[in-house]
Amino acid sequence: MPAFSLMIQGTTSDAGKSTLVTALCRLFYRRGISVAPFKPQNMALNSAVTKDGNEIGRAQAVQAYAAGLEPQVDMNPILLKPNTDTGAQVIIQGKAVGNMNAVGYHEYKSIAKVAALDSYQRLANQYQAVLIEGAGSPAEINLRARDIANMGFAESIDCPVIIIADIDKGGVFAHLVGTLDLLSPSEQDRVIGFVINRFRGDISLLQSGLDWLEERTGKPVLGVLPFLKGFHLESEDAVAKSPIKADSKAKLNIVIPIMPRTSNHTDWDALRLHPEVQVTLVGANETIPPADLVILPGSKSVQSDLAYLRQEGWEDYLNKHLRYGGKVIGICGGYQMLGEQLLDPLGLENQHANTRSTGFGFIPMETVLKEEKQLKQRQGQLAFAANAQVTGYEIHSGVSRFTDETQIAHFALLDDGKNKENSEKEGYISPDGQIIGTYLHGVFDHPDALQALLNWAGVDQAAAFDYDQFRDKEIDRLADSTEQNMNIDALIEQCQNFQQ
């Protein structure tokens, strides 16, 4: 079949771009079409690590999984990870090139675009189809110059575009018509149709609006996708604080602080979905409830998030929590916070060299931030649970060392999957068994590790839960719903005709 590309753009952030690309990846994969996801530029604190040690956006990793592929760095060549209100770490083809403010990155875009086009071309040469996800909205007037995330990229590679809008938020017709009107004539010409996402109710009541939209714009509505109750795929944007499963009789109550620069919040998705666990996410100025287990998550700016936690009363809470027998897990940045000292000699986090922050002091450890980031997938066994497999990935700039090597027990024994005799000790467990620290993101995803950690936290004979299996079923549910409400074969033909 002729090769083609298709770009999904949205009227707003969170319109459904990522989910539609995920659904189409699975549907093309089912048809035997070799398909790859691609997002030229992504801004997110929730990232993934490829097998060869590169960093990409979480959504592209999920889309690759839907397409039956291992995630590759070319699927997301530009990743921006905000570390201040006005700046971000810029990652090009999997490696950090530095911190930039908005003005600095705007000037850098011409270089970044070359990398994006280079990565796209490699995928286009390798796969029959490339499904491209835009970012935010293509109609942001102030961002149109040097755009490499939406229409600027579509124009560069000459591909068709679908615009998707979320009707659940209201104003869907204004969003679609307004977005189209703000595009240039050549950009409007490459829009092959609209998709309306998350519709609830009787579609016959929507038909008059759909007819008006098609007459007003000259563009077809390619599909109206229904709201999927209870649907969950890991998010890479803001943390959703609302529950993602129905209330249950929890055997374990977990509390997690949401910090200004919380990263990799998918770490606790498996916990939020587990039938015996209640997870409470605590934001600014909120009362911290009692808990059996506290998880300190990862952070893109550990020093400032550490100061935030102190300001919010978490230090006193943790001391009291541990005094009365509670458990604590620190993951990556949260692990560093549990130590004694955090040193930033190069000013990597706040542009001020030789800064030093005092940690909570629960682990005899100090961390020095280094310029080179550790990026790798990991596997092995939990050191405290016989035969419990653990998988995960590391994304961190800090190098930690224990200040007191006596009575150090490690969290896991990690290997390369080939030679287990050369296992590497990772993480920390306190002598009283109340505190765990680890650099492993995704530590709860493997069913063995999840069950063992729940047992450690106080759940007797915790129920098994396989997060990867759950995710695969959700992708299939999404794909089935999309297949029922869009003509996928006609869409493929439309894309092929556009690029002939």
From Swiss-Prot:
<keyword id="KW-0169">Cobalamin biosynthesis</keyword>
<dbReference type="InterPro" id="IPR002586">
    <property type="entry name" value="CobQ/CobB/MinD/ParA_Nub-bd_dom"/>
</dbReference>
<feature type="active site" description="Nucleophile">
    <location>
        <position position="332"/>
    </location>
</feature>
<dbReference type="InterPro" id="IPR047045">
    <property type="entry name" value="CobQ_N"/>
</dbReference>
<keyword id="KW-0315">Glutamine amidotransferase</keyword>
<dbReference type="InterPro" id="IPR027417">
    <property type="entry name" value="P-loop_NTPase"/>
</dbReference>
<dbReference type="Pfam" id="PF01656">
    <property type="entry name" value="CbiA"/>
</dbReference>
<dbReference type="InterPro" id="IPR033949">
    <property type="entry name" value="CobQ_GATase1"/>
</dbReference>
<feature type="active site">
    <location>
        <position position="441"/>
    </location>
</feature>
<comment type="similarity">
    <text>Belongs to the CobB/CobQ family. CobQ subfamily.</text>
</comment>
<dbReference type="InterPro" id="IPR011698">
    <property type="entry name" value="GATase_3"/>
</dbReference>
<dbReference type="GO" id="GO:0009236">
    <property type="term" value="P:cobalamin biosynthetic process"/>
</dbReference>
<dbReference type="InterPro" id="IPR004459">
    <property type="entry name" value="CobQ_synth"/>
</dbReference>
<protein>
    <recommendedName>
        <fullName>Cobyric acid synthase</fullName>
    </recommendedName>
</protein>
<dbReference type="GO" id="GO:0003824">
    <property type="term" value="F:catalytic activity"/>
</dbReference>
<dbReference type="InterPro" id="IPR029062">
    <property type="entry name" value="Class_I_gatase-like"/>
</dbReference>
<comment type="pathway">
    <text>Cofactor biosynthesis; adenosylcobalamin biosynthesis.</text>
</comment>
<feature type="domain" description="GATase cobBQ-type">
    <location>
        <begin position="251"/>
        <end position="449"/>
    </location>
</feature>
<dbReference type="GO" id="GO:0015420">
    <property type="term" value="F:ABC-type vitamin B12 transporter activity"/>
</dbReference>
<comment type="function">
    <text>Catalyzes amidations at positions B, D, E, and G on adenosylcobyrinic A,C-diamide. NH(2) groups are provided by glutamine, and one molecule of ATP is hydrogenolyzed for each amidation.</text>
</comment>
<dbReference type="Pfam" id="PF07685">
    <property type="entry name" value="GATase_3"/>
</dbReference>
